Amino acid sequence: MLSCIFQDTIFLSSFLAVSLICMTTALWGTILLVERQPLLSESLSHACYPGLLIGALLSYKVPAFSDSLWVIIFFGCLASVLGCLGISFLEKKLAMHKDSALCLVLVSFFGVGVILVSYVKDCCPLLYNKINAYLYGQAATLGYTEAKLALIIFCLSAVVLWWWYRQISVAIFDREFAYSCGLRTRTAELVVLVFISLVIVSGVRSVGILLISAMFVAPPLSARQLSDRLSTILILSSIFGGICGALGCYFSVAFTCQTVVEGKPISIILPTGPLVVFFAGVLVFLCLIFSWKTGWITRYFRRKWFLFSRDEEHLLKIFWYLREQNTYQVGMRDFVRSRKYQEYFGDKVFPRFRMFLLCKKGLVSCSEHQWSLTDKGLARAAKLVRAHRLWESYLVSQLDFNKNEVHHFAEEMEHVLTDELDSTLSQMLQDPDYDPHQREIPKRTRKSDGC
């Protein structure tokens, strides 16, 4: 079945066109996402609607422009650029909030488009059926001309992003620095605007005005979960966009079938545009869940591991506090009844498994049911207690906390004290010997002892 589908020239042209369009929208969508303007694609896609209709009317009415794709693209891009200029005017001249300006331009231009559609419906019924493809998408009507156009736009987009990469990246992350370096960021911004408008206009027939903004957002959002580098995000985003477009096209054809309802044959056709967006949404969901950097599962296990490590460190601190009371070896019952154990673990039973792990790590030893710290465990516990008491000293001396209110904060912060931060705090506090409660602060060891 797969080979039969790809031998169909009509399917192959629409397949290539949609895949290339989705790859291009993903490229420029990455720029919008990093600039924190993902809704701009939604506004510009609706703003181009009246321009597309005017271009379609001219190509239908004027013999010189008969069935000219370039006329439609030109007026669509013009309307989209005007929409962007309108947003900028509302923001800068009328001090309108960004979101309000986006919404106003969206509804205003789209309203004009709806008025034009009502006119077209009465005077040009044949054209009316054709322009519905702009609103909802109709990938099956995309031929090799559209596929070639999509390929040209994709190649131009890749070249422009490569050529203007430095200007665009600097303008995104530090506009003032770009101005001070003399980089032509204004030209780069204009190029980005023109290409976004061109991509929207050339792609509305594949996904539709109502859904094309999803392809500007979903693939970059998926790629952002996997990398922090702009260049990597651009590449991954383009790949994801192409995959979503290809899957949407294939499944819209593969799952088309006929059935019989009340004796009448009915064709069940899955539209390409919604399927493309559906797969893009599934991809975002999978990346949000399974991303190895920021995915929900990764964060869940990272948090569980932190809590597990924190409890191990609390056990070591309990041994330290017992040593301060001259108890160097302790049995299970006395350990559980100690004040610090009750503070950290409440009424929980003796943690045999955690103690077993601490023994395996060489931090705790057990002899005749008596537990004690090893030299390695003592160094680890000293580092934790030092971190706790340094943080208490910092909060009291530098941030004017009451000394009776800092214990809880220090309990949370002691687990994230690095060697560099330890040195910084020691210098800032002039290497104190005692904390605000007049308890001795353990001295820093030269070697972290596996900490």
From Swiss-Prot:
Lineage summary: Bacteria, Pseudomonadati, Chlamydiota, Chlamydiia, Chlamydiales
Keyword Zinc-finger: no
Protein name: Probable metal transport system membrane protein CT_069
Membrane topology annotation: Multi-pass membrane protein
CDD domains (UniProt xref): TM_ABC_iron-siderophores_like (cd06550)
Predominant localisation class: membrane
Disordered: annotated span: 432-451
Gene Ontology biological process terms from the UniProt entry: response to zinc ion; transmembrane transport
GO MF annotation terms: DNA-binding transcription factor activity; protein dimerization activity; transition metal ion binding
Any Gene Ontology CC annotation: plasma membrane
Family (UniProt): Belongs to the ABC-3 integral membrane protein family.
Location of the protein in the cell: Cell inner membrane
Ranges that cross the membrane: 14-34, 38-58, 70-90, 100-120, 145-165, 192-212, 233-253, 269-289
Organism: Chlamydia trachomatis serovar D (strain ATCC VR-885 / DSM 19411 / UW-3/Cx)
Basic and acidic residues: compositionally biased ranges: 434-451
Functional summary from the UniProt entry: Part of an ATP-driven transport system CT_067/CT_068/CT_069/CT_070 for a metal.
Keywords from the UniProt entry: Cell inner membrane, Cell membrane, Membrane, Transmembrane, Transmembrane helix, Transport
Pfam assignment, any one: Fe_dep_repr_C
